[in-house]
Amino acid sequence: IKMFNDAHARSLHVIGNHDTDNGHTKEQCLDIWGMPGRYYTQDIEGLQLVVLDGNDRGSPTHEGGYVSYFGKEQTKWLKEQLANLDGPIIIVSHQPLAGYAAVDNAEEMQGILGDAADKVILAINGHSHIDEVLRIKGVTYMHVNSASYQWVGGKYRHESYSKEVHAKYPWISHTCPYRDSLFATFTFDPKSLAVGVEGRQSEWVGKAPAELGVDLDPSLTNGGEISPQIRDRTFLRIAK
């Protein structure tokens, strides 16, 4: 974390579902990462980032596994921020607010952001390991792909590397790895409010999910959203 923070003029962090694995607490994450809170706002030369924590408990539809929810305290805070901030605003969360693998109260969150669509220029998330863009109630949502793999689970266990590698890192057999790391650079034009995305292209190591018979979700296509890439994009604001 120190190396990451030291490598950037300003480093911001968002809590994901795996960050509290192995008994780690959110308080430890906040302390070690230097976060001001588990959800917070940050102004960067007029661009206002609203960073959220999608790991609240209390979802009435939670059926086990990792929580994926925004509780009443946080949604109340979000509404207040959206009302008080002038914009432009980018929403940042680990769990998706729309589309595949969205939080349990996705419709509620989409309604909250939709009410502030004149200020919210983009909402970005990780978690889903796909490359997808949606537009709902005037707000654009982008799933930023995983850095390194697509999870396929134990049913589709297979070897993409040498037996020595799989013996040392057994969980790799539950994934379809990317040959190169993926990341994206976002740029913002304060005059036009356009957001540019410079992504990365890679390829599968070993078999692709489609070759294994993986059908991740009816809404997703292999070679489309399910692919080892983050596409270059430009998001333009609709003139009013």
Regions found by a protein language model. Name each.
Residues D19-G23, A98-V103:
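Acidic-and-aromatic substrate-binding clefts and catalytic sites of carbohydrate-active enzymes
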Residues V103, H127-S128:
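Alpha-helix N-cap/helix-start capping motif
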Residues V165-K240:
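A short C-terminal boundary segment appended to hydrolase-like catalytic domains
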Residues I1-K79, A83-N84, E108-I121, I130-F188:
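Extended active-site neighborhood of metal-dependent phosphoesterases/phosphodiesterases
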